[in-house]
Amino acid sequence: MSNTTVEQFAAELKRPVEDLLKQLKEAGVSKNSGSDSLTLDDKQLLNAYLTKKNGSNGGTISIRRTKTEVSTVDGVKVETRKRGRTVNIPSAEELAAQVKAAQTQAAPVQPEQTAEDAVKARAEAAARAEARAKAEAEAAKLKAAKAGNKAKPAAQKPTEAKAETAPVAAETKPAEPKEKAVKPKHERNGKGKDAKKPAKPAAPAVPQPVVSAEEQAQRDEEARRAAALRAHQEALLKEKQERQARREAMKQQAEQQAKAAQEAKTGRQRPAKPAEKPQAAAPAVENKPVNPAKAKKEDRRNRDDEGQGRNAKGKGAKGGRDRNNARNGGDERVRGGKKGKKLKLEPNQHAFQAPTEPVVHEVLVPETITVADLAHKMAVKGVEMVKALMKKGMMVTINQSIDQDTALIVVKKLGHIGKPAAADDPEAFLGEGAEAEEAEALPRPPVVTVMGHVDHGKTSLLDYIRRAKVVQGEAGGITQHIGAYHVKTPRGVITFLDTPGHEAFTAMRARGAKATDIVILVVAADDGVMPQTIEAIAHAKAAGVPIVVAVNKIDKDTANPERIRQELTQHEVIPDDWGGTVQFIDVSAKKGTNIDALLEAVLLEAEVLELTAPVDAPAKGIIVEARLDKGRGAVATLLVQNGTLKKGDMLLAGTAFGKIRAMVDENGKSITEAGPSIPVEILGLSDVPNAGEDAMVLADEKKAREIALFRQGKYRDVRLAKQQAAKLENMFNNMGETQAQSLSVIIKADVQGSYEALAGSLKKLSADEVKVNVLHSGVGGITESDVNLAIASGAFIIGFNVRADASSRKLAENENVEIRYYNIIYDAIDDVKAAMSGMLSPEKKEQVTGTVEIRQVISVSKVGNIAGCMVTDGVVKRDSHIRLIRNNVVIHTGELASLKRYKDDVKEVRMGFECGLMLKGYNEIMEGDQLECFDIVEVARTL
C-alpha cells in the first residue's frame, strides 16, 4: 500500500491522470507518466501543497467515505453502495507532530544524535506506524468475519473506502486517528460494539496511537450528547405510556359510572366491576430503557391491530377470536350485513340497551323562518314538521316561511323549548360585511341637492346646468325620468340629486343615509325668503350639510340681492363677506350668469369636506326614484354611495330584491359598473322599492330573500296602519309609531303603602306618546340625595305627607327643582295627568269646507294660469288649503294665491257663485278639474 502508481491513485481519487500529474509537479514531486510509483512522502507533499493552495488553516479535514461493492447476479453487474461515514483527516502539521511523538515513545533521541540519525529514525517510525495500521485492519476484518451478519462494523477498512469530495487520498496516512461519530440506533443498544473496538497491535514493539486532549474532549462531548438524547427519548416514551394508562383508567371509570347510573334507573343495580385495565397497563410504565424507534413501531402496530382487526391473521385467526370470546365471557355478537363487525360486550353485560331520553333542543325562532330551517334547528325530519303544521290546519310546504308565533307553538308541541330570537337586522348584517371586507377609501364626487321654492327658479337652474354641461348638442337631452345625474367640469365631477319635493330628502335623513353632501339653496332675488326656504334651511342644518346660496333672477329689474342676504341672516345663514361661512352666488338661470362660479363654489365646499368612499367593496346606495315600466318591469334609480355596483350583483332594497339584469346611465347608455356618487337605472328587482330606501349588495341570495321576506312581514302592519290613518275616526291608532316622551318622577311618602299605591296609579297613566317614569320611591322625608337625583335626571319630586328639610329646600330653589306636596292621592294623580296632557302634541283634523269645479282656464303672461270656477258645495275661503283632484286622483295639494269675484279680491265665495282663483306655486290646471277646500284644525288632547 506504501507504493502505488499514479494511475491507481488517480482512479482512487476519481480524477484524471493528467490533472494529478500537474498537481504533483506543482507540489514538487517529479512524475512523468501514470505508471510511475508514488510513495507515502509524495502523498504527504501533495496533501500539504493542496492544503495551502485551498486556503486551509491546517486544521483537521472531514471526508465522507462510502463503500461500493460490485457483484454479479445472473451475468448482470450490480453496484451496491453501503452507508458512508465521516473520517477526520489531520493536517500535515498534526501528522508530523504525531510521528514525532511516536518516535519519542519508541526510542528517546540522544542529545548527541546527528541529523542523519534523526532522518533515519523518522523513516523507521513511519514504517512502524504503517505496519500497525495494517495489523489493526486485519484484526478488524477477522472479528467482522466471526460476528457474521449479527453486527456489521461501522468502520470499514481504509483501503476499501473512497473519498467523494476530498481531492486527496489522505486515508492512507500511517497514523490515522479513530473518529468518534454519533452511533446508529442499533449500535446504541449494544450491537456491533466489538466491531468498533480497535484491534490490538500485532507486534508488542509497535507503539499505541497518540490521541490529543482536544480530540479526546470532543469524543467525550459526543458521548455525553448521545447519552442525553437517549435519556430524553426514554423519558418521553415513559411519559406517553403513563398518559395512555391514565386515559384508559379514566375511560374505565366513566364507563362504570354510566353503567351504574343506568342500572340504578332501570332498577337492576349491579356491583360495579373493579377496574382491571389500569392494573394490566401498569407493567408498561416500568422504568426500563426502551428503544424509541422500536417502541414507536410497536405502538403503530398495536394501533393498526386495534383499529382494523389485524390480530386475526393466519390460520389460527378463528381460534384466536374464539379464545378472546371465551375470555370475555362469550358475549361477542355479529352484526348483520356483508361486513358484519363484532359487537364486543363486557362480562355480565346484556345486549339490550334501555331507551335514552329524547334530546330537548333550545330553538331560537326569528320573526320569519322556513319550515326546513325550523326542522333543522330541532333535528327532526321535514316531513314531521309538515305533518305537525297540517294538524294545526296549515297547508304548507317545506320551503314556505311561517311566522314566529306559529313556529313557537310547533316547537312546543314537538317537545322542544322555543325562544323568540332577535329580529334579523339588515344593517347589522351589512356592518359585518363591511368589517369583513375593508377597502381603501378613495376620493369621490360630491352629491348636491338643489332645494328652494318652486317659483324661485330651481327647475330652470337645473335645466341650464343639464343642457350646458351634460349633453351639449344631443337631441332630447338626458332621460327625463331619472332623478339624478352628474356633470363634468374642468375641476371635477358633480352629482346632482333632483328629487321631487322634500319627501325623499327627509326620508334619507330619517334613515341616517348621508346621500347629500352639499345643499344649493335657490332664493329668488325679487321674492325673498319663503316658508319653504326656511324649511329647506332646517333640513340642511338637521343633516349637518353645508349650504351654498344661489340668489337667482338677478337679471330682473326688481331684484334686490342685499335684501335676501339680510333675511337669510335672521335664520343664521350668514354670508362669507359678512364674516360668515356661507357662500352667496348671484346667478341668472335664464341667461346663464355666474353658473360656472356656482359650480366652482360647490367644488370648493367639496374639497373642504374631503369626501372619500371605498371603491373595491360591495355597493351600498339609496333609491332616488322607482317606477313600474310596462316593458321592463320594476325600474329604480340608484345612487351609489359606497363600493362599486356591477351587473349581476344581488341587490336588496327595502322589501325588493333581485339580481341586476341591466344598468343604464343618465344618458340612456348601457354600462356594466358604477362607482361611488354615480346614479344608475337598474332592472331586475322583484318589486318596485320606495323612494329613499337603502339598497345594498349581498353575496348570498338566500340571505337577501330572507331579509326581504322579513321586511315584508314587518311592514305589513305598518301599511295597514297607514290605511287606517286615512279614516278620521282612527287617527289615534297611529300614535305609537312616534317616539314616546317620558315624565320622570321621584316619590317620597310617609308609609310604604302610600308610595306603592301612588307609583302604581301614575304608571297606569302612561300612554303611547307620554310615559311616566318613576325613578325612585321610598319612605321618609325629602333629602339632598333626592334633590341631586332630580337634578341629574330632570325629574320633579312628589312628597306625600312628608316635607323637605331646610338644606334640601335651598338646594332645590337654587337648581330650579320642583317639589310638590300632597295629602290626597287623587290630587297628585290629577296634577300628573294634567302635566302629561300638556306634553301631548295637539291633534290635527282636516275639515272640508267646500268643493269647486274648474270650468275655464285663462293663461295670462307674466301671471300664470287663472281658473274660472263654480262653487258647487260649501264655501271657499282665501286662506283655505286646496287639493287638486283630476279623474278622482289627487294631483296637487297646496294653497290659494288669490281669490276674486269679477275684479274684486274677496275673502270667501259661497255655493252657487262663480269666482276666479290662482294656485300658489302650481299652474298645471285643466278644465274639468275639481278643487277640494279644507281647513286644518288643531284640537288639544287629553289623557
Curated annotation (Swiss-Prot):
Residues 452-459 are annotated as: G1. GO terms for molecular function: GTP binding; GTPase activity; translation initiation factor activity. InterPro entries: DNA-bd_dom_put_sf, EF-G-like_DII, IF2_II, IF2_N, P-loop_NTPase, Small_GTP-bd, T_Tr_GTP-bd_dom, TF_IF2_bacterial-like. GO terms for cellular component: cytosol. Residues 443-612 form the tr-type G domain. Its main location: cytoplasm. GTP binds at residues 452-459, 498-502, 552-555. Residues 588-590 are annotated as: G5. Keywords: Cytoplasm, GTP-binding, Initiation factor, Nucleotide-binding, Protein biosynthesis. Residues 552-555 are annotated as: G4. It is found in: Cytoplasm. Residues 99-113, 145-172, 200-215, 251-264 have a biased composition (Low complexity). CDD domains: IF2_eIF5B (cd01887), IF2_mtIF2_II (cd03702), mtIF2_IVc (cd03692). Residues 477-481 are annotated as: G2. Residues 117-141, 173-197, 216-250, 295-308, 319-335 have a biased composition (Basic and acidic residues). It comes from the Bacteria. Residues 99-354 are annotated as: Disordered. Residues 498-501 are annotated as: G3. Belongs to the TRAFAC class translation factor GTPase superfamily. Classic translation factor GTPase family. IF-2 subfamily. One of the essential components for the initiation of protein synthesis. Protects formylmethionyl-tRNA from spontaneous hydrolysis and promotes its binding to the 30S ribosomal subunits. Also involved in the hydrolysis of GTP during the formation of the 70S ribosomal complex. This is Translation initiation factor IF-2.
